[in-house]
């Protein structure tokens, strides 16, 4: 059996990879707002580079959530205590919800006090951790049943509505349907990330950890099983997508082959459909296996560093983007209607590369500080 540190390096590397991809999407949301993309995207009129950049970013949330569940099991295995794990998940989940409501929402809106709070990915991860804290006392069989039932079955609930029952409707907005929860004229909450499917994904990560990240399997066997899981997930995605009956909106043959591929990959993220989860979690598990094989390579170290301080990076990069945007508006004014924006998707990637290089020294220093000061409790949440 590999040591926890060996395991965590590949996990941190994958986490680092997806948060850097995520930053590209956040650069898009900062400097490309004049080209809005709905969910799912509209194929006609969406430039190919924008479409595939967005599709790549779809990898981020499901991979991050499944790794959160996997890491929860590794924490439990390291401490040999379900109770400690339950307390850790509860505290960290509530901490993430606090960050979303106060720190992260301000980075997006610049409003304090806010009149709108967007409940986005950090909120979804935090609430999912709170729910997982209550589930880990169940048997593995029931955890697998709960996880797979949510992931595979939640699309059957797509047409459910409680429009005549406001309290239930607000709860449904939190669980499965994007919507607005309003408290008079005081404040509104936008449930950007309905949480029910993410509860299934985080529980799946925990189940994967419990099943194969233990003394029963050595590294080679574990990677073989992970690869099998990943390939099976993608294969099931392809089969269900070809059948075109369940798991997401239907795709269609388009005027060009590229547009047909775009239609095939045009999946629903809010909330994440069955097919969205199958495709992206499958790719994530395959990437985890590949990174396990190259984790000692020098070029992987920066990914490990970024992945070791994910929440610190998340907060810092949002405020850096906000500062850059306000500076650009001050210097150049609005260039695309009410927004300042760049003209090409390639510029978004260039900005992202520059930010990656610029932020790496800070992440390196904070990662070292975090590991040298484990007695500072709040650091383990960052």
List PLM regions with ranges.
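Alpha-helical transmembrane segments and their immediate juxtamembrane cytosolic regions
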Residues: 1-382
